[in-house]
Regions:
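Short, well-ordered loop/turn and helix-capping segments at boundaries between secondary-structure elements
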Residues: 25, 225, 341-345
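Short, solvent-exposed polar/charged micro-motifs at secondary-structure junctions
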Residues: 42-44, 70-71, 188-189, 251-255, ...
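C-terminal active-site/capping subdomain that shapes the small-molecule cofactor and substrate pocket
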Residues: 256-352
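C-terminal substrate-binding/catalytic lobe of Rossmann-fold NAD(P)-dependent dehydrogenases
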Residues: 211-289
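Short beta-strand or tight-loop elements
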Residues: 131, 239, 303-305
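Conserved active-site and cofactor/substrate-binding residues in soluble primary-metabolism enzymes
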Residues: 14, 130, 154-161, 210-218, ...
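Short Gly/Pro-enriched turn/cap motifs at secondary-structure boundaries
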Residues: 207-211, 248-249, 296-299
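N-terminal Rossmann-like NAD(P) cofactor-binding subdomain of oxidoreductases
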Residues: 1-204, 208-210, 231-236, 310-313
Length: 352
């Protein structure tokens, strides 16, 4: 059986490590190069002892010619604004890319500059429009033919999947949407930070970036596209959301609670039906029937997005609860799901 050759750039971050764990056991993948500027020259098992006797692979510095020549597809799991200088060169060499940063998620380069504070060259502006947003449950057909996939953020994945069916079917008002999300500490990455020290996080629960989180424009862009249609000029006005992230004293997992105003009276059976129909071909979405609701512990360690809801008739609201593993469906698992689709493999290959 012929395998596709894969390299991972940024293989020693949390998402990069999860990619390696999945890919080393993927039956259709040959893991060629693991790139890490911080640990080049060391064996990955020296950095993560869990790979001892499982994977014998030396970490290397990035070399465009070496990586592109040996790879069919490359994952870039790098900090935001870093991938944008590297991805165009890989694409020029004929290599497909799944980028886990935010660098190619935002279609409007002015919005990208506003939120990420990076100037764009002309090539990058063009790639913003060419990149496919890698949410398979919505963009499956586009991902199949994509050369560059922008892997969604963790919070946006939980939110967009959670409420897309309601917006698509106009069951809710596109205004006044409130999103309350909680994430485990790994969502902040491996970099050192006082606020992420054990003594700061343990036995604590706090909100952060309560007005301006970088995932807001991504969520608004995709919800607007779902509601108004990708080609509808009305989406320029756009859906606005009030988003508040929180940090949980756990390693991984996200739980999002979204509050939306119903358009008229809706029964649970009606809402359940649109969710089941919308995701009936989505292998990694699990719909909970009321009164059951998702919990983080059900989703952690899987590539599933679990979705449940409750209708508060007294105030005319629907509350949607979704849960994912931020490092899997929110990062590495979804990236491999996209790789599978781009390569013509079953979506679930290597993930179940």
């Amino acid at each position: 059986m012929k395998k596709i050759k894969i390299s991972v750039i940024g293989s020693t971050g949390y998402a990069g490590k999860e990619l390696v764990k999945i890919l080393m056991n993927h039956q259709k993948v040959e893991l060629v190069h693991l790139v890490s500027s911080s640990y080049a020259g060391k064996n990955i098992a020296e950095i993560f002892p869990e790979f001892l006797n499982k994977l014998d692979k030396k970490l290397i510095n990035f070399n465009l010619d070496v990586v592109s020549q040996d790879s069919d597809l490359v994952f870039t799991a790098l900090p935001h604004t870093v991938s944008m200088d590297m991805v165009p060169e890989l694409l020029k060499k004929g290599v497909k890319v799944v980028d886990l940063s935010a660098d190619y998620r935002i279609k409007d380069f002015a919005v990208y500059q506003e939120w990420y504070k990076k100037e764009l060259n002309q090539i990058s502006k063009e790639l913003l429009l060419e990149a496919v947003y890698g949410l398979p449950e919505i963009y499956l057909d586009k991902i199949k033919d994509a050369l560059l996939v922008a892997n969604p953020g963790c919070y946006p994945t939980s939110v967009i999947l959670g409420i897309a069916p309601l917006l698509k079917h106009h069951f809710v008002e596109p205004v006044g949407i409130i999103i309350d999300s909680k994430s485990g500490i790994s969502g902040a990455g491996r970099k050192l930070s006082l606020g992420l020290h054990f003594a700061e996080c343990n036995e604590n629960f706090k909100a952060y970036k309560v007005v301006r989180h970088n995932h807001i424009p991504e969520v608004e862009q995709e919800l607007s596209s779902v509601y108004f249609g990708a080609d509808n000029k009305e989406q320029i006005k756009g859906i606005k959301v009030s988003f508040t992230p929180h940090l949980l004293p756990i390693n991984r997992g996200i739980l999002s609670t979204c509050y939306l105003s119903l358009r008229g009276s809706k029964k649970e059976e009606e809402v359940l039906e649109i969710y089941q129909k919308y995701y009936h071909k989505a292998p990694f979405v699990r719909i909970f029937e009321p009164p059951n609701l998702p919990e983080i512990k059900y989703a952690v360690g899987t590539n599933y997005c679990d979705i449940g809801f409750t209708i508060d008739e007294r105030v005319g609201k629907i509350k949607v609860i979704s849960a994912i593993d931020n490092l899997l469906k929110g990062a590495a698992g979804q990236a491999v799901q996209n790789m599978n689709i781009m390569s013509g493999f079953p979506e679930t290959c290597g993930l179940v």
